[in-house]
């Protein structure tokens, strides 16, 4: 299957550069995956599309302020580090810029010197293994010194770091936000509960690979990045019960979707307490085992994410919906508007 089949024209002005003042002020396009029918709505009205007994599954990961700007201890030369993955304890895999300034043994100092990192290994493509030294609690030091690693298509600075976190974020470890969840407020979640909709959480730590374009010509040749996920025993039991009672399982975002499909795929369509790494790649032809619908944002042309939603709703339906979104000037990507596929 050609990657070009998932291309569409997107004016740059429709790429949202900043979040809206109110999280739930975003627009909502509803796509009937069976008929292809489109409805223009607003996120504040999303409750009306849910039924009592449905279950909403959210990803409670929290984004690390993983961009650190420091100086080499010996020369004072500027260095940027991007935290990619925690190895063990205070050892992290990072991306260094400019990489040539960071050799094995290089010490980088951040802020007022209360955070230091020493390079223990040089990797390819600018990767560096670093061991951190600090006083206090690492994540608190990081919160005060680090910046959010915003996607490459966002050029504006973020005034409030919390706007790149969901209101229910809890488990620290992502390099990017699960952006479909950014629209939710505490009020909307409460209104859904009041209607009899069950709210459940999984964790998937989003990697920077989520922004990596599909460089292959053929969809099947693309290699997905691996991301860590986990589901508790309580959540697994709750989801199995929803399924038994005939309720719908609606995932929030591609990250929740990939987690649920990974787990159901490994347990004959059932949910079980699990943790591990998933590199599941969902594209047209995939048979869904876990979800009945999903809430998502509008994705990049030719990305693995537009392929995932095309698997759920059909490629032609998705491209028609996206063309409608362009005509109606919906906002695209991380800080953009939302789509509900049911």
Swiss-Prot record:
Under Gene3D superfamilies, the record lists: QueA-like
Tell me the subunit arrangement.
Monomer.
Keywords annotated in UniProt: Cytoplasm, Queuosine biosynthesis, S-adenosyl-L-methionine, Transferase
**Associated pathway:** tRNA modification; tRNA-queuosine biosynthesis
GO BP annotations of the record are: queuosine biosynthetic process; tRNA wobble guanine modification
* Protein name, as recorded: S-adenosylmethionine:tRNA ribosyltransferase-isomerase
Q: Where in the cell is it found?
A: Cytoplasm
Q: Name one Pfam family in it.
A: Queuosine_synth
Task: List the Gene Ontology MF annotations in alphabetical order.
Answer: S-adenosylmethionine:tRNA ribosyltransferase-isomerase activity
Family of the protein in this entry:
Belongs to the QueA family.
Superkingdom in the source lineage: Bacteria
Which reaction does this chain catalyze?
7-aminomethyl-7-carbaguanosine(34) in tRNA + S-adenosyl-L-methionine = epoxyqueuosine(34) in tRNA + adenine + L-methionine + 2 H(+)
Role description:
Transfers and isomerizes the ribose moiety from AdoMet to the 7-aminomethyl group of 7-deazaguanine (preQ1-tRNA) to give epoxyqueuosine (oQ-tRNA).
Q: Tell me the InterPro entries matching this sequence.
A: QueA (IPR003699), QueA_dom1 (IPR042118), QueA_dom2 (IPR042119), QueA_sf (IPR036100)
Per UniProt, the enzyme's principal EC class comes to transferase
> What would be one Gene Ontology cellular-component term for the protein?
cytoplasm
Keyword S-adenosyl-L-methionine part of the UniProt annotation? yes
What Enzyme Commission number does this protein have? 2.4.99.17
